Every structure is written in C-alpha cells, then in structure tokens.
From Swiss-Prot:
It comes from Arabidopsis thaliana (Mouse-ear cress). It is found in: Cytoplasm; Mitochondrion. Thiol-disulfide oxidoreductase probably involved in the redox regulation of a number of cytosolic enzymes. Possesses insulin disulfide bonds reducing activity. GO terms for molecular function: oxidoreductase activity, acting on a sulfur group of donors, disulfide as acceptor; oxidoreductase activity, acting on paired donors, with incorporation or reduction of molecular oxygen, reduced flavin or flavoprotein as one donor, and incorporation of one atom of oxygen; protein-disulfide reductase activity. This is Thioredoxin H2.
Amino acid sequence: MGGALSTVFGSGEDATAAGTESEPSRVLKFSSSARWQLHFNEIKESNKLLVVDFSASWCGPCRMIEPAIHAMADKFNDVDFVKLDVDELPDVAKEFNVTAMPTFVLVKRGKEIERIIGAKKDELEKKVSKLRA
C-alpha cells in the first residue's frame, strides 16, 4: 500500500527512526533518484550546508555511526542531513564517485567542499561545525 508515495518520498521509517513521536529525526532519506534530484536542486540555490551520508543496509560501520548522525542533525538544525542507500540509488552514488561506505559528502551551493570516508564521527562533527556558517 502507498506504493506511489513510498517510491517518491521513501519510507518514513528511516527518517524517523532515531526521533521520538513528538520530535522526528531531521535526517531525510530518499529512495528515488528523481526525488533526491529535486531536493538537491532546491538546496543548491541556498547557502545551506548539505551533508550526504552514503551508506548501505549491510554496512556495519554505517549502522554504528547512524545514532551520531541523528544527534548531529538535531544539534546543527541549520544543516541539511540526507541519508542515501547506495544499493537503492546506485546512480547517485556513481555521480558522487562513492566507492566505500560510509562516505559523507559535504556540499554547499551544489559543489562538494569536503569528503569524509569512514565512520569518523569526531572529524565529521568538526567539519560540519566549521563549514555550516
């Protein structure tokens, strides 16, 4: 049920997994390349920092760092956090030259400004804090 909306917007499960009922997670998840592209085009018009978390459901380090990503999204509410599964969106992973998971690509105005490969929570948090302004 809800196939068309689930395809366009993705399932809401991952987007709210680390949140509470009154406060859902701020990490967006896209299961559709078209929906991702719409979001990417919209955000590149702003000066807002975008953190793209390329992960996979089978990736242990990806699952390990996920709670920290949700905490960062709550802490840095002026930053846009997006989680993309490389198996669901291989074309987007290829476009960003992602070859290992997790890979975090930090983007501003549509341009990559930083890349972190691996579950390096402290490094990611420092870079997000520095680049969000």
